[in-house]
Amino acid sequence: LPISEFYTADCQKNTLNIERKIRNLMREVTLNKGGTFTIKSVEVMPESLPAVFTRLVADNVGQYEKSLVIDLGGTTLDVGVIVGQFEDVSAVHGNPDIGVSMVTKATLTALKMASSDTSPMIADELIKNRNNLDFVGQVVNEVSKLNLVLDTIDTAINKLGELVVDDLLQYRNVNRV
């Protein structure tokens, strides 16, 4: 589950959400070729926090050090503060209004303005390859709008960065990010 759904606002496990997730997964599954199997056991974990566990151990993080874990997804920003090597989770936060899709949407709008109506997949590839002018030229139909498209991408990325930083200001007192 996303951090903000796995934990309550006071950093306790949200047993209601966890049980709901388990019930949703404990079922018979039918494969494409007709075979079936039943899921008999499920362990629900908070997204992104376990991913840093090996790093915390490798870095020999002390028991009182606080680590800020940031998970910037397509449509959400999830944050957790881990104490030590996962001895405790001292803060959780989720913001459903901040995500990478903000850049994708801005790019799609700019592409439409450049007579290049396309898909989110192509927009995402353009964002990743925006410094490859050969690729940009293949995607942007109206060459006179090429700078508009690239400027829109840069502006959207900068805006996303500002929103993330602003949203994380309350976590200034951590030891590591």
Explain the meaning of each model-derived region.
Residues 49, 70-81:
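Hydrophobic, aromatic-enriched interface-forming segments
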Residues 115-136:
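Conserved, helical-rich catalytic subdomain that frames metal- and/or nucleotide-binding sites
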Residues 1-69, 87-100, 133-177:
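Nucleotide/phosphate-binding catalytic cleft detector across ATP-hydrolyzing
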Residues 80-122:
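Glycine-rich phosphate-binding loop plus the immediately following alpha-helix
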